[in-house]
């Protein structure tokens, strides 16, 4: 159904148009995408004729600032936060609406000597400002176009146009596939672009390393920053990591209520302590503490989920009532930290099959699952049973 990201990059570099689809639970739409620097009048005309949507130009924050392209509105109420700037035409255009003149405006935007006074406002070209971090921060067509331009080694700007069917309704994936086949276009997804970037780019920075004596033993604490979202994570390392030998590893998601306050609603605190004890006894291992509170939904939303649980919902139902998946955690950043530490093979302390799959998917080998089941109590028994029944956690009752 979909093509490889590498194939799409090659086509874009040749000046061709591709189709980029987003997720079904987002806009569930496809856009024509091209490099801005290769947006000839023919490319623009193709998008207008067969896309039928609004032709926009995703650019960086730096370019928007340089050309004084202010936001179209002061208060953006769009559900997806699409960052339109004021629309523009190049100063030497006439009406600015033809494919030729829109192409002229786009090329003028990319001129390194361009200045704010070169453009009339409003106009017929609609710049969109991509978030820093690209699709890793916002999974939109705006960010995808700029990311793809960068991956092509081109100027970081694109041209996009929503694809609408002849009857005026939005083209969905099956329709988009037919269009791609008709015009021999590559078709990719933003989801695949996200995974491609996570595989190819280093997204963590090692910041500091100190010795940390604890009640469980002495560990080396190594702090990391996610360079995309700024979140800070820490690895507690015991002994020497030998890449070719399996390392005992626990990837533990932050749980303030359980880890710090000793909440009985979950088993997080006891799991954290048990993992540290086992690593200390082993004499070599890693506990990776990830800032993914509440299975990724954050502290306040976790407390909201607790409120719903008090009304009879289980932990999965509560997340879904709040509009979140049952488990929003991502293991790509954790995998990059483990690789930075020299871990390639691991004995993973977990009951969660998704964690095993997630880490394997980022090139790490899980040679053994080491169970980490804690005794249930009257406060968390339903929670644990729900994880067993609905999330597939490997638990025994």
UniProtKB/Swiss-Prot annotation:
Record's cofactor remark: Binds 2 divalent metal cations per subunit. Magnesium or manganese. Binds 1 zinc ion per subunit.
Pfam family, one: DHBP_synthase
UniProt key word Nucleotide-binding: yes
Highest taxon of source: Bacteria
Amino-acid positions noted as binding Mg(2+) 1 in the UniProt annotation, renumbered to this chain: 27
Positions contributing to Mg(2+) 2 binding: 27, 141
Binding site for GTP: 250-254, 271, 293-295, 315, 350, 355
Catalytic residue list: 327, 329
Region named DHBP synthase: 1-199
Sample GO molecular function, one term: GTP cyclohydrolase II activity
Ranges where the record places region GTP cyclohydrolase II: 200-397
Disulphides: none
CDD domains reported for this sequence: GTP_cyclohydro2
Annotated D-ribulose 5-phosphate binding sites: 26-27, 31, 138-142, 162
SUPFAM superfamilies to which the protein is assigned, alphabetical: RibA-like (SSF142695), YrdC/RibB (SSF55821)
Protein name per its UniProtKB record: Riboflavin biosynthesis protein RibBA
Naturally occurring in which organism (per UniProt): Geobacillus sp. (strain WCH70)
Lineage: Bacteria, Bacillati, Bacillota, Bacilli, Bacillales
Name of the encoding gene: ribBA
